[in-house]
Amino acid sequence: MARRSRGRFIDGIVLLDKDTGMSSNFALQRVKRLFNANKAGHTGALDPLATGMLPICLGEATKFSQHLLDADKRYTVTAKLGERTDTSDSDGEVVQTRPINFTQELLMESLEHFRGETMQVPSMYSALKHEGQPLYKYAREGIEVPRKARPINVFELNFISLEGDELTLDIHCSKGTYIRTITDDLGEMLGCGAHVIMLRRTQVAGYPYERMVSLEQLNEMVSQAEADGVEAKSVLDPLLLPMDTAVSKFREINLAESQAPYLMNGNPVHASGLVADEIVRITIGEEHKFVGIGAMNDDGMLAPKRLIVIREDEVKA
C-alpha cells in the first residue's frame, strides 16, 4: 500500500524574514508545519547570525528553487573594525586586535577593489563540501583544506556609514558570494581587521522587501485565525507568491490548450519564437497558466525540462 503523503497540496513561495539565531532548516520546518504543506524547500541558507529574506518554496514550487539559488542577492552588513575572528563573524573567537587608523581615502579605495568581477576564496567556515564534508567541520577540528578561488560579481558596493568602530555597507552580488570573506579581506586591506556583527539579506532576485513575513507574524496570524474560528490557511495562503515568480526572468512561450496534453506527457511540441540554448517559461491558453520550463531541442521543437503536476482539483477549478 502506498504511504499517504503528509500535509496538504499547496504551491507557492513564502518570503520569510528569518530571525537571528535560528538555522535556515529550522525556519523551513516551522513554515512547512504552519502551512501544513506536504513539501517544502528553501533557496539558499542564511547563517544563524544573519537575518532577512529566505524564500521558502512549497509544493510544486520546489521544482524551481534552484533558479532562486542562482539569483543575485542584496545584503546590508555591519562590520566591527579592529578585531579579526576565526570565523569572520561575531560567532567566532577573536584572534587578533589592532588599532583603527585608516583614512577615508583608503576606505574608499579599498571598497573599489571589491566591485565588479573578482575571484574569492571561500571561508573555511562555510557549507561548501570537501570529500563529502562541509568545510566548517574541518575548521572546527583545526584542519585547513585547500580551496580554489571562485568567480563572483559585486554589482554594487555602497558605503552607508562609519560610526565609531562599526562600518555598514550595502552589497548587491552574484550567487556564491561570501559577505564574511569580503568583510575579512576589507579589514586586512584597512590594516585593522574586521568581522561581521550584523548581516541582513534584503533581496533575492527581484522579490520585494515589503512582502517578507517573520515566523512571529505567521504564528500570530495562526493564533488569531484560531481565535476567530477560521482555518489558518485562509489567512496564510494569501501570503504566497505564485511559483512562476521563481522563473520570471525567463521569456514566456504561450501554447494553445490543444498542445497541453502532449507537452504534459513529456513530448516536445511546435512553438514559434524559440532560440537555441534559451530556457523559456511555458504557459497554456488564454489564461496563461504556468506549467513549467522548457527549451528548444535539436529538432527545433519546444521540449519540456521541468513541469509541474496539475492535480485533479486544479483541473476542475
Curated annotation (Swiss-Prot):
This protein's name: tRNA pseudouridine synthase B
Enzymatic reactions: uridine(55) in tRNA = pseudouridine(55) in tRNA
Active site per the UniProt annotation: D47 (nucleophile)
Xref: CDD domains: PseudoU_synth_EcTruB, PUA_TruB_bacterial
Provenance organism: Shewanella woodyi (strain ATCC 51908 / MS32)
SUPFAM superfamilies: Pseudouridine synthase, PUA domain-like
Alphabetic keyword roster: Isomerase, tRNA processing
Protein's GO biological process: mRNA pseudouridine synthesis; tRNA pseudouridine synthesis
Annotated coiled-coil segments of the chain: none
Molecular functions per Gene Ontology: RNA binding; tRNA pseudouridine(55) synthase activity
Tree of life domain: Bacteria
Parts of the chain that traverse the membrane: none
Family in the record: Belongs to the pseudouridine synthase TruB family. Type 1 subfamily.
Function: Responsible for synthesis of pseudouridine from uracil-55 in the psi GC loop of transfer RNAs.
Pfam families in the cross-refs: TruB-C_2, TruB_C_2, TruB_N
EC number: 5.4.99.25
